[in-house]
C-alpha cells in the first residue's frame, strides 16, 4: 500500500507532548514511524569515543513518532487534513480530502 505520509511532507502533531507543533518529515521508517524536524526532541547520554574523536555528554536528538499521531498539513486551509488516492493520467496521485487539491 502506498504511504499517505512521505518524506518532505509538512505535518502537524495530533497527540503527545508536542501536540499542535508543525514540522517537515525528515525520515519515514517501514514500521510505521516518522521523524519530524524539531519535534519529539529527546536527550541522550552518550559515552565519549576517543578513537573517533567524539566527546561524550548530553546530546539532544529527534525521536520517531508513530504515523498515527501526525496528520498532513494543508496550507490552503491551514489545518490538518486527510489524504486520499486517485488515478490521474495513468498515475496514482495523493490529494487532500477537504478540497480535492493534489499534493
UniProtKB/Swiss-Prot annotation:
A GO biological process held by the record: translation
Full protein name: Large ribosomal subunit protein uL24
Single GO term (MF): rRNA binding
Keyword annotations of the record: Ribonucleoprotein, Ribosomal protein, RNA-binding, rRNA-binding
Role summary: One of two assembly initiator proteins, it binds directly to the 5'-end of the 23S rRNA, where it nucleates assembly of the 50S subunit.
Keyword RNA-binding: yes
Single GO cellular component term: ribonucleoprotein complex
Lineage: Bacteria, Pseudomonadati, Pseudomonadota, Gammaproteobacteria, Pasteurellales
PROSITE patterns listed in its UniProt record: RIBOSOMAL_L24
Subunit annotation: Part of the 50S ribosomal subunit.
UniProt family annotation: Belongs to the universal ribosomal protein uL24 family.
InterPro entries in alphabetical order: KOW, Rib_uL2_dom2, Ribosomal_uL24, Ribosomal_uL24_CS, Ribosomal_uL24_KOW, Translation_prot_SH3-like_sf
Xref: Pfam families: KOW, ribosomal_L24
